[in-house]
Amino acid sequence: MVDYPSRKKEWSYDRKLADAKAAGFDAIATAAIPEVGRAAKKHGLTVLGYFSSGKQEEFAGELKANKKIGAHHINVQLADEDTLTPEALGLALILMQEGKSLGLEPAVEMHRDTCTETPEKAYALADAYLKVTGELLPITWDFSHFAIVKHLHPGNYAEKLLVCPDLIQRAQMFHFRPFNGHHCQIPATDGNGKLTPELKDWLPFAEALLKCWLDGNRNTNRELFVCPEMGPVASGYNLSTLPNSWEDAKVVRLEIDKIWKKLTTKRR
């Protein structure tokens, strides 16, 4: 919702979150911005936190700042693309220890320009974390980054990406950014309100991913937070000639909700 509806006439946080609530959203993903925390509380939205850091001395302060605005689950983009696994492991261990001491649940995001920017680096970190702690690494999954790294196509999204069901089922935060093998974000609509062929190609993967998570979380009360993440023009994810990313995010939310209801109805 950055620069929404335009850079010159950007809405206040309160108005943005009121619109999110009206559109059916249950939560807001945000950095530790006090105004967002207050608006989220006003509109009854769960706060999911965020920060990016590769410096262990910053972790406690960042976690506390996120806790202060109401976040319990906190997404962390950890370190840099040239951070090697031994250093990344040390940082992840400290991050989780700091989070536990504060009663928080941080999770390491799979993201470019971090220590998890490729599947190989991400799974090496997860393997090392499991070896040291005996526990699965808490992860925020964003498969759009892995898809472009591996140059995938709709026919092999699930085969190539859903290779660690235990880590997927352990996770509670997912970024459902529609993608293909060339673009980490594709438009959801064609500018006239119709779903794009590219989104339709991606939706079966979204269903396979949700099914995978549900298969490991039957008869539990664990929460799942799915963000239909459509980045704005300001961040470079969206392009100026494509439909507005926030309006597209609303459409993606509806499509994901349809899939969720289909899968959970089958379980009963």
Regions found by a protein language model. Give the residues of each.
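A cross-domain feature marking catalytic cores of carbohydrate-active enzymes
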Residues: 1, 30-32, 49-54, 76-80, ...
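N-terminal pre-domain/capping segments
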Residues: 1-71, 253-268
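Histidine-acidic metal/acid-base catalytic patches
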Residues: 3-14, 70, 126-130, 134-137, ...
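Acidic-and-aromatic substrate-binding clefts and catalytic sites of carbohydrate-active enzymes
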Residues: 5-10, 25-38, 51-60, 80-87, ...
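A generic short-segment signal for beta-strand/edge and adjacent turn/coil regions
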Residues: 15-20, 76, 90-92, 106-111, ...
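Alpha-helical scaffolding segments of alpha/beta enzyme cores, especially the outer helices
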Residues: 15-19, 35-38, 42, 61-68, ...
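Hydrophobic beta-strand segments of well-ordered beta-sheets in folded domains
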Residues: 26-27, 45-49, 72-74, 105-106, ...
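Active-site acidic/histidine proton-transfer and metal-coordination neighborhood
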Residues: 46-47, 51-138
